[in-house]
Amino acid sequence: MLRWNEESSQAQAAALTRPAVSASAKVEAICKTILAKVKEQGDDALLDMAKEFDNRANPRLRVPLDEINASEQALSAELKYAIDTAYANVKCFHEAQLPKDIKLSTQPGVVCELKYQAIEAVGIYVPGGSAPLPSSVIMQGVLAQLSGAKTVVLATPVQGDKAINPAILYAAKLCGITTLIESGGAGAIAAMAYGTESVPKVNKIFGPGNSFVTMAKQLVAQTVPGMAIDMPAGPSEVLVIADERANPEFIAADLLSQAEHGADSQVILLCNSESIIEQTQQALTRQLAKLSRKETAEQALANSSLILVDSIAQAFDVSAQYGPEHLILQLADSTPYLDKVKNAGSVFVGDYTPESAGDYASGTNHVLPTYGYSASYSSLNLLDFFRTYTVQTITKSGLTQLSKAILPLANAEGLDAHANAVSIRLEAIKNEQ
């Protein structure tokens, strides 16, 4: 336990310091080699890498449409219900975010518009691993579907002789995704960035991944004209603010649900009760012993802090300084504090709002800024799948009046041609009279 007010500023900073995350020069070099190979060789490069990295004897790239359509037959009723519910809730929440164009007159004869346009082609990356991640498909695929993007490509790795898990295929089917690519890592990112014989080129790439995926996304965003990515990625994290009436078992469960993500995850508790912190420590020990990913969670807890603060108000100040990906509020009454929330990716209010709900099915998005980026980045939302452009229409009388602002500014900035583009029109208007 760390007593916040008794610690030096250096110790306080250390308690909020995240595990170092830095891509090695080796990772960057490998990614550059992979990107170049895919750019030059297309599908052949992807198939070669599937054999080399994924141990696939007879790899393929595109998943046939009939496999996607038949996927639900392989699901249990329980899992199908879960995916259907998550899809419906995420769609409901994000559908309300559909943007509306703006059109107004800034002054007589001057009309300005803001128009929203779906990004035409988007790529979604879904990591592989020991278990399928249909929730990752839903959190990104629903938004692509609602935006009306013309092309949506989903890439996910396949190991050995396995096929893409039917839960992934079914989630993709619900989201209207028909272009599924059996490819992972930096190669998949390169394929979506450059395009190959089987993989359409996209304009923006979404989705988490390992250090190779993260580096590849950064590289294509820097080198491929017009390419964008969603947001910087980092280890998962949660910060819990709790008071003296909070449930220590609930707190421990929430902390461990993040700690099990990875050894580089970080969890922090800010509480004004020494007794609750001590009980939480005991609950962590009990619950940790039952976890299948106990070793991973233990390593994450080594990077974590249980902090005693003087007041809940102070806890919010410390939280704002940290900028958590997930912020959980276990307070007798959170209402007075909601406006004090700063720099948090997503907030979970009350004893019965576990972070797991947002990860899967409440309706909010689980793609969130980590590593302190919540101070400047937002959770993934529908606007991330749109671009905007502006329109202005000016009448003769409108330009005549507006020229009184344009000409002095153009002259002050020494841009004669700018001024002339207005003056020549004013002269034409004068000659018409």
From Swiss-Prot:
Q: Which annotated residues bind Zn(2+)?
A: Q258, H261, D359, H418
| Pathway listed | Amino-acid biosynthesis; L-histidine biosynthesis; L-histidine from 5-phospho-alpha-D-ribose 1-diphosphate: step 9/9
Which reactions is this enzyme annotated as catalysing? Answer: L-histidinol + 2 NAD(+) + H2O = L-histidine + 2 NADH + 3 H(+)
Entry-linked Gene3D superfamilies: 1.20.5.1300, Nitrogenase molybdenum iron protein domain (3.40.50.1980)
Does the record's keyword annotation contain Kinase?
no
**What species was this sequence derived from?**
Pseudoalteromonas translucida (strain TAC 125)
Documented EC number(s) = 1.1.1.23
Q: Which UniProt keywords apply?
A: Amino-acid biosynthesis, Histidine biosynthesis, Metal-binding, NAD, Oxidoreductase, Zinc
Primary enzyme class: oxidoreductase
Q: How is the cofactor bound?
A: Binds 1 zinc ion per subunit.
Q: Cofactors per UniProt?
A: Zn(2+)
In which residues is substrate bound? S236, Q258, H261, H326, D359, E413, H418
GO MF term set: histidinol dehydrogenase activity; NAD binding; zinc ion binding
Which function does this protein serve? Catalyzes the sequential NAD-dependent oxidations of L-histidinol to L-histidinaldehyde and then to L-histidine.
Query: What is stated as this protein's family in its record?
Result: Belongs to the histidinol dehydrogenase family.
Q: What is the lineage of its organism?
A: Bacteria, Pseudomonadati, Pseudomonadota, Gammaproteobacteria, Alteromonadales
Gene that encodes it: hisD
How is this protein annotated for GO cellular component? cytosol
Q: Which InterPro entries match?
A: Ald_DH/histidinol_DH (IPR016161), Histidinol_DH_CS (IPR001692), Histidinol_DH_monofunct (IPR022695), Hstdl_DH (IPR012131)
Which SUPFAM superfamilies does UniProt cross-reference here?
ALDH-like
Q: What's the name of the protein?
A: Histidinol dehydrogenase
Q: Which GO terms describe its biological process?
A: L-histidine biosynthetic process
